[in-house]
Swiss-Prot record:
Official protein name in the record: Ribonuclease HII
Cofactor stoichiometry and binding remark: Manganese or magnesium. Binds 1 divalent metal ion per monomer in the absence of substrate. May bind a second metal ion after substrate binding.
GO molecular function: manganese ion binding; RNA binding; RNA-DNA hybrid ribonuclease activity
Domain of life: Bacteria
Organism: Lactococcus lactis subsp. cremoris (strain MG1363)
Taxonomic classification: Bacteria, Bacillati, Bacillota, Bacilli, Lactobacillales
Domain RNase H type-2: 71-257
GO annotation (BP), single: DNA replication, removal of RNA primer
């Protein structure tokens, strides 16, 4: 008696190589259900191979350092330089050697629905994680660029392990640690991408909490960015303690110098 479609699907699920003899074996099965299962599994394997290749490319900078016997590599990234309200949040993440996390990418390229699952895997696998937070008052005092650097240095200081090298998205920090500045690093380095996810989820959760305190501004949806609803609330209710007075249109509203 031949195998049922359910049994064939179970066998296909175990295959990871398109050259496996089972694919040839099932090609001759004319049942529509078998052919659909074959097509689906082949598509999955191709997608998995493409993802493996992408993740391998995201270890390019890390592998260069591994070749120099440097393994404690901290990726650093920020979230929240552009919003009108809320803090700038940074993260530093040290991943184990050759760590691959499926779906890991620049947080802006990862569907929000997957942020928490990827964060959980980062937290499970990372050797160390540090987070830095600088509030709106400090941003107004020193400017967003300097505030971001302060937050990044905070994040590094909170790591439980001392990194041997820093991979940073487009910045250089005043720290006695070797560094590599990488443009668009959050999409090119696994370590920086991990930091971007940690920083993004941390900041989003903070903005949800601020939304409970200031419900009129829709912070849980706009994360402090200047959406139409947020700008309308500013006009109607004025600014809050978490608004950045050095950012327009708030700067003009309060005559910030």
């Amino acid at each position: 008696m031949g195998q049922t479609i359910k049994e064939i699907k179970a066998r296909l699920a175990d295959l990871t190589d398109l050259s496996a003899k089972e694919f040839l074996e099932f090609e001759t099965d004319e049942r529509a259900g078998v052919q659909a299962a074959l097509k689906s599994r082949k598509k999955q394997i191709l997608a998995e191979c493409a993802e493996d290749e992408r993740l391998e490319q995201m270890l390019e900078f890390e592998k260069e350092l591994y070749s120099q016997e440097i393994e404690l590599i901290a990726g650093i990234d920020e979230v929240g330089r552009g919003p009108l309200a809320g803090p700038v949040v940074t993260a530093a993440v040290i991943l184990p050697k050759n760590c691959k996390i499926r779906g890991l990418n620049d947080s802006k390229k990862v569907p929000k629905s997957k942020h928490h699952a990827i964060l959980s895997e980062i937290q499970e696998k990372a050797l160390a994680i540090g987070v830095g937070i600088v509030d709106a008052e400090k941003i107004d005092e020193v400017n967003i660029y300097e505030a971001t650097k302060i937050a990044m240095i905070q994040a590094v200081s909170k790591l439980s392990l001392k990194p041997e090298h820093l991979l940073i998205d487009a910045m250089v920090l005043d720290l006695p640690i070797a560094q590599t500045k990488i443009i668009h690093g959050d999409a090119r380095s696994a370590s920086i991408a991990a930091a971007s996810i940690v920083a993004k989820v941390t900041r989003d959760e903070m903005m949800k909490d601020f939304a409970l305190e200031f419900p009129e501004y829709d912070f849980e949806h706009n994360a402090g960015y200047g959406t139409a609803k947020h700008l309308a609330a500013l006009t109607k209710y004025g600014i809050t303690r978490i608004h950045r007075k050095s950012y327009e249109p708030i700067k003009s509203m309060v005559n910030f110098k």
